[in-house]
């Protein structure tokens, strides 16, 4: 792609990371190109679209195909500087006429998932093409058909070669989206390292669990703590939330959309931050307070002579090992404080909270 297809950062002097385009934006541009070729016999290249917030990006076509009664166009997704697993994937739209009066029908082609569970924005049995991309494609197809005096009765099939393999790196399998990736996007723009997409996936996970009648969900900070909790509960995949560092994303959504029981599992350092009151546990946005750990250790019986060693410790794990070496448990009090943070954030929502603290090997240090 050339510079025409690269989203401009709103303040180039301050922003160093490059934005990209969503799969939904790519699918919309590919659909516009395919429908135009189906009607006129010629592919617009580059092809421009209007995004929901008014941006007008242009995309070069990576693939063109024109046959009897159908047209295909493909665009390589550029996610900018975001570590998006779909970066470099080819988003292909195949368009052909549908029977009169049917309107626009969306189908999942190779590498695009199909929804199988309740609770998502798209009902079971439908292609995993989210509402905003559907609306963008519908509007652009209706406009083109109106321009040529044609009815907007079309079948649009979106395909992503290799999408089934890419989907294994996403939470689609746990959400009950099988066979490939989802076609996503609300603005059309991918903002590098944005938290919003991750938090959105947490919310959709809770929606799916609620729709399935699941009474117990698990949010873990990483795979080690997740495995430790799963060894206890063996919850179904759709009951495991993509929490990571975003404890607040889980708790605030459960506050309005409660599930009977929540288990939060995490390493000692991450849950120390939660115990301190932090809801974003990422190292760039919250840090372990050694003074807080000393207060916990002192209440647990640590001698005054240990204070300086704790305050000067390099990591939370070093503090844990220091206290363990003299037989003092600080993981239990940390779990209790973390639970209090969770309950405070839930603001009385009917959710029972359990905290599991693990070490780096997945051994359970505390469970309250």
UniProtKB/Swiss-Prot annotation:
Pfam families: CbiD
A GO term for molecular function: cobalt-precorrin-5B C1-methyltransferase activity
A biological process from GO: methylation
Gene3D superfamilies: CbiD-like
Annotated keywords: Cobalamin biosynthesis, Methyltransferase, S-adenosyl-L-methionine, Transferase
InterPro entries found in the cross-reference section: CbiD (IPR002748), CbiD_sf (IPR036074)
Keyword Ribosomal protein among record annotations: no
Main EC class the enzyme belongs to: transferase
Keyword S-adenosyl-L-methionine recorded: yes
Top-level taxon of the source organism: Bacteria
Disulfide bonds: none
EC number: 2.1.1.195
Reactions that this protein is recorded to catalyse: Co-precorrin-5B + S-adenosyl-L-methionine = Co-precorrin-6A + S-adenosyl-L-homocysteine
Biological pathway: Cofactor biosynthesis; adenosylcobalamin biosynthesis; cob(II)yrinate a,c-diamide from sirohydrochlorin (anaerobic route): step 6/10
Family: Belongs to the CbiD family.
Database matches in PANTHER family: COBALT-PRECORRIN-5B C(1)-METHYLTRANSFERASE
This protein's name: Cobalt-precorrin-5B C(1)-methyltransferase
Taxonomic path: Bacteria, Pseudomonadati, Pseudomonadota, Alphaproteobacteria, Hyphomicrobiales
Encoding gene, per UniProt annotation: cbiD
């Amino acid at each position: 792609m050339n510079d025409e297809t690269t989203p401009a950062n709103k303040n180039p002097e301050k922003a160093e990371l490059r934005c990209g385009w969503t799969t939904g934006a790519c699918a919309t541009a590919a659909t516009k190109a395919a429908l135009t070729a189906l009607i006129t016999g010629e592919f617009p290249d580059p092809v421009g679209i209007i995004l929901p917030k008014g941006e007008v990006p242009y995309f070069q076509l990576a693939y063109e195909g024109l046959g009897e009664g159908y047209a295909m166009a493909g665009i390589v997704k550029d996610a900018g500087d975001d570590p998006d697993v779909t970066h470099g994937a080819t988003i292909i739209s195949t368009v052909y006429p549908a029977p009169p009066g049917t309107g626009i029908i969306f189908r999942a082609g190779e590498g695009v998932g199909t929804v199988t569970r309740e609770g998502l924005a798209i009902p079971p049995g439908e292609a995993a093409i989210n509402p905003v991309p559907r609306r963008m494609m519908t509007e652009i197809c209706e406009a083109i058909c109106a321009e040529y005096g044609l009815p907007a009765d079309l079948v649009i099939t979106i395909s992503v070669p290799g999408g089934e393999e890419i989907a294994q790196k996403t939470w689609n399998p746990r959400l009950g989206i099988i066979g490939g990736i989802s076609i996503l996007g609300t603005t059309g723009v991918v903002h590098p390292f944005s938290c919003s997409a991750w938090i959105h996936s947490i919310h959709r996970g809770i929606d799916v669990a609620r729709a399935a009648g699941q009474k117990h969900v698990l949010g873990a900070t990483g795979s080690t703590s997740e495995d430790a909790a799963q060894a206890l509960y063996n919850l179904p995949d759709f009951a495991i939330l993509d929490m990571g560092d975003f404890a607040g994303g889980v708790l605030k959504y459960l506050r309005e959309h409660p599930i009977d029981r929540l288990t939060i599992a995490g390493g000692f350092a991450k849950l120390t931050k939660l115990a301190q009151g932090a809801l974003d546990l990422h190292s760039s946005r919250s840090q372990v307070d050694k003074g807080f750990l000393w207060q916990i250790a002192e209440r647990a019986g640590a001698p005054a002579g240990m204070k300086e060693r704790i305050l000067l410790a390099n990591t939370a794990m070093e503090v844990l090992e220091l206290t363990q070496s003299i037989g003092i448990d600080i993981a239990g009090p940390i779990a209790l404080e973390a639970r209090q943070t969770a309950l405070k954030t839930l603001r009385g929502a009917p959710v029972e909270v359990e905290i599991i603290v693990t070490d780096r090997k997945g051994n359970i240090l505390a469970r309250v």
